[in-house]
């Protein structure tokens, strides 16, 4: 009997440990009362991805320009959202690639100015403004690892970095230049580039931190205008619901994971652990 009890205890501890580690790096709370309009030329958005079908973009046109509150000075560039509509009872996954600074609807706390491709999933264009939408954040199902590009005009003494192809948004970018032993955090601009004004000739290290606190490192041999590099890693999205997959990165289609309101994998494991503890308690009573 003692052996069985010990086995159950170890099982519970194992599942509780797994549950604790598998947490989504951002809040997935369901937000209601959102609205949406549409615009017809989504390329060259404020997040710096240029042509959406090009090497910096998501590879499709299911995108949105965010109002100032959601855009948050560029901090939500590259964030993906699952938006649901009462007009069609459908949802669509989009990536934030632009800002919507116009007065009016864009000034609302939760407003999306969508591409026509995304808008059409949620309602007819003749409606004009969609009201009563709900949304939550989801990881972007990008292919490959996180990438980095140095801005046009970069030189040995100044550069700026665009971080793209990430499943989650970026919290911080730091640089360790030649001859230094510590990293220096950079400032993110409202157009989504991280500015590094104190470079020197030679190689340097870049440290990229996700909103979940994970780090990716890359060594770059020299500053070179518009030079692109792929890192060796991608950020984890364990514990997130609605993680999209596939060649399109899940954009334009409903999320493939659990719906909001159902347990994520981590929550399910927690419930399983509690169930195991209940069994342990019953065994000890006997």
UniProtKB/Swiss-Prot annotation:
Q: Is Membrane set as a keyword in this record? A: yes
PROSITE patterns per the record? Answer: EXPANSIN_EG45
The primary site where this protein sits is membrane
Kindly give the Gene3D superfamilies that the UniProt entry links to this protein.
Answer: Expansin, cellulose-binding-like domain, RlpA-like domain
> Membrane-spanning residues where?
266-286
Q: Which GO terms describe its cellular component?
A: membrane
The chain positions of domain Expansin-like EG45 read: 44-145
Q: Which residues lie toward the Extracellular compartment? A: 22-265
Please give the function described in this protein's UniProt entry: May serve to lubricate the movement of the cellulose microfibrils during cell growth and wall extension and/or they may serve to maintain the fluid state of the slug cell wall.
- State the protein's name: Expansin-like protein 1
What is the organism field in this record?
Answer: Dictyostelium discoideum (Social amoeba)
Origin organism lineage:
Eukaryota, Amoebozoa, Evosea, Eumycetozoa, Dictyostelia
What gene name is given for the protein in this entry? expl1
């Amino acid at each position: 009997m003692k052996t069985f009890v010990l086995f159950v205890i170890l099982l519970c501890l194992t599942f509780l440990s797994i549950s604790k580690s598998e947490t989504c790096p951002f809040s997935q709370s369901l937000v209601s009362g959102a609205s949406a309009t549409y615009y017809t030329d989504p390329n060259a958005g404020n997040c710096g991805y240029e042509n959406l079908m090009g090497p910096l973009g998501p590879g499709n046109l299911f995108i949105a320009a965010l109002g100032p509150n959601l855009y948050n000075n560029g901090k939500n560039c590259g964030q993906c959202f699952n938006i649901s509509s009462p007009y069609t009872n459908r949802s669509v996954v989009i990536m934030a690639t632009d800002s919507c600074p116009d007065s009016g609807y864009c000034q609302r706390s939760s407003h999306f100015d969508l591409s026509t491709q995304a808008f059409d999933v949620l309602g007819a264009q003749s409606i004009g403004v969609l009201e009563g939408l709900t949304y939550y954040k989801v990881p972007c199902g990008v292919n490959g690892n996180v990438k980095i590009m140095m801005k046009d005009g970069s030189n040995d003494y100044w550069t700026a970095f665009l971080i793209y192809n990430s499943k989650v948004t970026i919290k911080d970018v730091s640089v360790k230049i030649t001859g230094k032993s510590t990293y220096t955090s950079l400032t993110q601009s409202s157009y989504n580039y991280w500015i590094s004004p104190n470079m020197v000739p030679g190689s340097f290290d870049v440290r990229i931190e996700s909103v979940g606190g994970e780090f990716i490192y890359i060594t770059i041999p020299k500053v070179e205008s518009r030079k692109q590099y792929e890192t060796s890693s991608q950020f984890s999205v364990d514990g997130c619901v609605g993680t999209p997959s596939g060649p399109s990165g899940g954009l334009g289609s409903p999320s493939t994971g659990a719906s909001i309101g159902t347990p994520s994998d981590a929550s399910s494991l927690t419930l399983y652990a509690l169930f195991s503890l209940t069994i342990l308690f019953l065994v000890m009573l006997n």
